[in-house]
């Protein structure tokens, strides 16, 4: 593309967000740019003592319908859409007595913010902008002749362009792309909201008839899951791990993000102070402690200290100096927490490569999706909120009711097993995992792996959780032989009676939840 700068002689400004408007208007006025504006924007500019032409004066038609119609007029849109490279367009403008615009500055009604505020349906509908997107799209389409600006963050660029003879063709193209993304995001937000309103009234399904998402490129990553795969990070509208603040360390990798997401979610599954250590999206250890977050970290690390080497650590509480000193002794890829005690970051930063992140708590509602060939699978997030996740609703199927202390361990184990890839068996004792068997294609092998990871001493007297039912008694029998005292599992197998009989025979307490927590 050639430079092809277009000097800015005439500008159309219509903004809901008045941030930076004063400086922008003054800069345009200094360069003798004619300003046409609407409603409250025109009033604000006039208050500054800057000449401004109200749009109704331009069109000869008054603003009407409570402001719904202001700029939807040929006198406005012809000035935006005229391709000044074409003699025929210039001739028609002259015949119609319409002057072209070289700059259009528009931002839109705050629809998303209105929805987020809890406003009623009619109030939200009133914030659906019509004229604004029309002007933005028109200017973006005609970027060979017009520069379009949709964010106050670009006002300094406008001031610079005024000094250099206008925006270049390449700059106008970039601004046009931003503008189309802006209106696309706006339309997706409106369409998604409308679909959700309809779904809420549909007795047959809770899912909207249309799903749209918008994500913006944050940065390219060094590579993907493997070095031969390219990768990038895109961010959405909901704040979370992707927007985490990094205090120290190398750039986050693709695998760092996937493991950190698993760790962050695992830690926040628990209401008590919790630390989760994750490797390849599976727990090396999870622990809770009312004593201190440092104690939780010690117990989580003790579960599988070998696998924890090079893992990701997530804490659902502030990282203390004591915990930071412990982590600093271990090779760790990432540590993530909601906050850090004064001095903790400095201690952790002594390790050159550790990535230290601070993030907001993960969203505890909504849906999650997974791409498949030709489509998208969408499901409600598994948030440990099923009826069977409450121990008050468990059924005692075998053995005697356990003590409050043992029940607390069973509750912990049941919550923790959600974060383990299926088939999953998790052993726990005193609020900490002691053995985890994950990702096996049969449950008996997961049981063997969990027992093997725990070792005979730690397995004895521990409790166990299974993410799904035991299809045969053999998986349970592995646990019973290892000295497990109580088991919590969903139940629902056609061989439940055989499994329960085996539990009674072994003298092991068994609770059935009626809820399942597969994770694939």
Swiss-Prot record:
UniProt GO BP: 'de novo' IMP biosynthetic process
Pfam families xref list: AICARFT_IMPCHas, MGS
Q: Which GO terms describe its molecular function?
A: IMP cyclohydrolase activity; phosphoribosylaminoimidazolecarboxamide formyltransferase activity
Query: What Gene Ontology cellular-component terms does the record carry?
Result: cytosol
Q: Which residues form the MGS-like domain?
A: 1-150
CDD domains reported in the protein's UniProt record:
IMPCH
The molecule here is called: Bifunctional purine biosynthesis protein PurH
């Amino acid at each position: 593309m050639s430079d092809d700068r277009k000097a800015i002689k005439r500008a159309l400004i219509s903004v809901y967000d008045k941030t930076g408007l004063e400086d922008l208007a003054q800069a345009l006025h200094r360069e003798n740019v004619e300003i046409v504006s609407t409603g409250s924007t025109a009033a604000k500019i006039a208050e500054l003592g800057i000449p401004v032409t109200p749009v109704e004066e331009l069109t000869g038609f008054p603003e009407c319908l409570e402001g719904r119609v202001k700029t939807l007029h040929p006198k406005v849109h012809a000035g935006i859409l005229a391709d000044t490279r074409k003699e025929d367009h210039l001739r028609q403008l002259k015949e119609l007595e319409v002057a072209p615009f070289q700059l259009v500055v528009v931002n839109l009604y705050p629809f998303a913010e209105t929805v987020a505020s809890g406003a009623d349906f009619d109030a939200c509908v009133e914030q659906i902008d019509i004229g604004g997107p029309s002007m933005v799209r028109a200017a973006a389409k005609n970027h060979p002749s017009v520069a379009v600006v949709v964010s106050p963050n670009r006002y300094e660029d406008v001031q610079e362009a005024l000094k250099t003879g206008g925006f270049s063709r390449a700059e106008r193209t970039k601004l046009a792309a931003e503008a189309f993304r802006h209106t696309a995001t706006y339309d997706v937000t409106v369409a998604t909201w409308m679909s959700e309103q309809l779904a809420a009234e549909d007795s047959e399904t809770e899912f909207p008839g249309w799903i749209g998402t918008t994500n913006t490129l944050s940065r390219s990553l060094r590579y993907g899951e493997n070095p031969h795969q390219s990768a990038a990070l895109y961010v959405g509208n909901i704040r979370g791990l992707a927007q985490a603040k990094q205090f120290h360390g190398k750039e986050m990798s693709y695998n760092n993000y996937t493991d950190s997401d698993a760790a962050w979610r695992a830690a926040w599954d628990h209401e008590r102070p919790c630390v989760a250590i994750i490797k390849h999206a599976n727990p090396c250890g999870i622990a809770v402690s009312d004593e201190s977050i440092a104690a939780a970290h010690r117990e989580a690390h003790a579960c599988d200290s070998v696998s924890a080497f090079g893992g990701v650590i997530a804490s659902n509480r502030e990282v203390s100096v004591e915990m930071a000193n412990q982590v600093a002794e271990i090779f760790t890829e990432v540590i993530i927490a909601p906050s850090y005690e004064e001095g903790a970051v400095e201690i952790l930063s002594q390790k050159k490569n550790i990535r230290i992140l601070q993030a907001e708590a993960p969203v505890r509602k909504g849906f999650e999706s997974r791409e498949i060939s030709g489509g998208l699978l969408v499901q409600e997030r598994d948030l440990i909120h099923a009826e069977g996740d409450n121990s008050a609703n468990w059924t005692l199927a075998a053995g005697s009711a356990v003590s409050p202390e043992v029940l607390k361990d069973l509750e912990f184990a049941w919550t923790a097993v959600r974060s383990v890839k299926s088939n999953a068996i998790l052993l726990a004792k005193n609020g900490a995992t002691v053995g985890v068997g994950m990702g096996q294609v049969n449950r008996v092998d997961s049981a063997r792996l969990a027992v093997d990871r725990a070792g005979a001493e730690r397995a004895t007297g521990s409790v166990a959780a299974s993410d799904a039912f035991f299809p045969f008694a053999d998986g349970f029998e592995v646990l019973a032989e290892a000295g497990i005292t109580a088991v919590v599992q969903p139940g629902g197998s056609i061989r439940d009676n055989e499994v329960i009989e085996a539990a009674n025979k072994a003298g092991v307490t068994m609770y059935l939840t009626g809820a399942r927590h597969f994770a694939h």
